[in-house]
Amino acid sequence: MITGIGHVAYEVADMEKALDFYCGKLGFADAFELKHPETGAPWIRYIKVAPGQFIELFYGRQGENPGGSYSHLCLKVDDIQAIAAQMREKGAPLDNPPSQGSDGNWQCWTHDPDGNRIEFMQMMPDSLQSRAER
């Protein structure tokens, strides 16, 4: 079952300007940063909006994108295997099977008819997001 929105993700051209906007101007908290699992380079900054709600800021947007910098919508679920099974049963696209991400949570992906990416995420008690809540 879907339990809420976990995060909205954007690709940003200038992380310092983005952090100034979301943290400095809007007052959200800079919760933590994920390093890329293959390169170790800075990859994603998590901005805490409210308990259990985050904005993901991805490093490295290249050039100007007239369509904006939307990356994906994340929906929190209580059972990642059940949502994957539901997607298959209903004939909806499942872009990848459930897997554990770098943050410690379980995830799988789909897309809407227009190609907008949607992530399903089962939050784990010891994930980076859960630790940021403490």
Task: List the predicted regions and their residue ranges.
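Vicinal oxygen chelate
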Residues: I5-A13, I44-K48, G63-R134, ...
